[in-house]
Amino acid sequence: VTSPQVKYIHAGKIYDSNSGKYHSNKTIIISENIISSIEDGFIDPKNDKIELIDLKTKVLLPGLIDFHVHMESESGGKERYINRFQDSKADVAFKSTVVAKKTLLAGFTTVRDVGGSGVNIALRNAINKGVVDGPRIFTSGKTIATTGGHGDPTNGYRADLVEDPGPEDGVVNSISDARKAVRYRYKNGADLIKITATGGVMSMAKNGQNPQFTEEVMKAIVSTADDY
């Protein structure tokens, strides 16, 4: 029988977010990637199968959570717009793995990815399976918007270059469309539903304050999501 993977971390200081205080000279014991206990003092490993990580000069804190990220579009810089025309889904996926690792190394262990092409769902799955390094992801997959609204993926394009998007693409204009869009996201493995209920930087609206959904359509989205 293989013994469980155990790690000891010698922490100079640990920030306790519950009390708002720092605790000095602690040993964090990790068993099978789960923190099993935090002990006083610096405890030496019992055998050479236990990995020791020396962070006596460092300050440790619980993992941070970012509630609004877009892992697919964080890379690219000035070329981000032209990349929408040139990058395949594979290109987007490879670039998003780099962003995921940078996010984790920055201290964010959980993020909520609210809107993308659907690659964000595959990225979440790859991280959960240990294929790539990254934070725990809760994702909406593609957002849900109205025609011309904030989140319509065809905004800004000539009409002859793109087809009229529908519920699977995240564009709805009726109660029936709304229910179908939510069901597509459930089918594709989304953790949550994102709707862009008002205008924004990606919409054709003159301002971001006016509603873009009817109340009936929003109720249909919420009630359908609640079914799952």
Describe each region flagged by the PLM.
Residues 4-5:
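Boundary of Sec targeting at the N-terminus
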Residues 12, 28, 33, 57, ...:
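Divalent metal-coordination and catalytic microenvironments
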Residues 14, 19-61:
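Histidine-rich, glycine-flanked metal-binding segment
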Residues 58-129, 147-154, 216:
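Metal-associated gating/positioning segment near the N- to mid-region
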Residues 70, 140-144, 198:
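Active-site beta-loop-alpha junctions enriched in small/polar residues
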Residues 81-94, 157-180:
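Active-site mouth loops of central-metabolism enzymes
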Residues 125, 129-146, 208-228:
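Alpha-helix-loop-beta-strand connector modules within alpha/beta enzyme cores
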Residues 177-228:
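Histidine/acidic residue-rich metal-binding segments in metalloenzymes
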